[in-house]
Amino acid sequence: MGKNVVVLGTQWGDEGKGKIVDLLTEQAKYVVRYQGGHNAGHTLVIDGVKTVLHLIPSGILRDNVKCIIGNGVVLAPDALMKEISMLKERGVPVEDRLLISEACPLILPFHCAVDIAREKARGNKAIGTTGRGIGPAYEDKVSRRGLRVGDLFNAELFAEKLKEVMKYHNFMLTEYYGAEAVDYQTTLDDALAMADYLKSMCVDVTEMLDQARKAGENILFEGAQGTLLDIDHGTYPFVTSSNTTAGGVATGSGFGPCHLDYVLGIMKAYTTRVGAGPFPTELECEIGDHLGTKGHEFGATTGRKRRPGWLDAVAMKRAIQINSLTGICLTKLDVLDGLEEVKICVGYQQPDGTVTTVTPLAAEGYELVTPVYETLPGWSENTFGVTSMDQLPQAAVNYIKRIEEILETPIDIISTGPDRNETFIRVSPFN
């Protein structure tokens, strides 16, 4: 009997999901992306060689794994082609292992133009999007004017639909934002030029996954971004445009939720956030500099510097609730090496002086709270590359145990470096 495992981020993204997906796919037959787009940045390091994937599932580096892009993903054909070319140059076979849902909404050049124009218009209230058209593409989907991958396979109908949607977006660009219009003919020609190539990879994803489940295959669902960026449950409006939580698996792939066996939440040993938005445990001091420098905290997609802070157990408890986490993978433990003390946020002090252990429902509430910390001794020993609990310094072991106690959730996997080998699995999600 196969296992169906979800791997997702529990914080504001950048938790190290790509590495863990790559590690676990040694036991999986299928890896499925179910939300987001090429705003994701999943970094894999294998034998010292770094690969950054934005759209293609991280299982692509395992020769025996089929990679699926589900209907919940907004797909930029040009970005997909670039990523495929990059992988092929490295000798990674792609076409016979990458499968795509025809129902994926398309990201086209006008989506990117609107995204950039909108961020510019927001001024100092900008959300900090990647500028890759993710939000506008999801807007088109919800408004029922969006174009999907399957539309490309009828050139005449696609041209008509494209003309209509571009009338709307070009009007917004020129009349509201004062930006340049996007050329219709160029957009049409470029999109149709990729139609046959995309068609060769399209399948009925729901049917394929159901057949794989019935055949007893192991399936891994790969989340992008993180729980606190979820459009419904995150620090709204400083969020992404998709459901990054476990509930997004079913809607974004057509896989029945009752068939999910294990949900693994990826959590850094501290917290980071990239872009704008509230961040109660943010450290704008030497310790923050230590975390940012030692952790190489720069966005894999945008290159922007990430904002570091202490581990936020209040936010983590909400992530555990929303996702029904089975277990946690703790990453970047080694980044805490050399600190005299480490802190865990165990509560939020509100303006009236009361302390809560429940997260606010919107960004404004986060901005009003002050973190309440529990302080533990740090450690000077090196944990980089350690692959068993008995090799860790006692202070690091105590930190891990205390996190488990506070969160009431087991830490089943621990990562102590960027390479797939710098990890130890205490409990495997597939066993």
UniProtKB/Swiss-Prot annotation:
Domain of life (superkingdom): Bacteria
Binding site for GTP: 13-19, 41-43, 306, 332-334, 415-417
Ligand binding (IMP): 14-17, 39-42, 130, 144, 225, 240, 304
Alphabetized UniProt keyword annotations: Cytoplasm, GTP-binding, Ligase, Magnesium, Metal-binding, Nucleotide-binding, Purine biosynthesis
Gene Ontology CC terms: cytoplasm
Pfam families linked: Adenylsucc_synt
Cofactor, free-text remark: Binds 1 Mg(2+) ion per subunit.
Locations listed in the record: Cytoplasm
Annotated active site: 14 (proton acceptor), 42 (proton donor)
Classification via HAMAP family: Adenylosucc_synth
Subunit-level organization: Homodimer.
Name of the molecule in the record: Adenylosuccinate synthetase
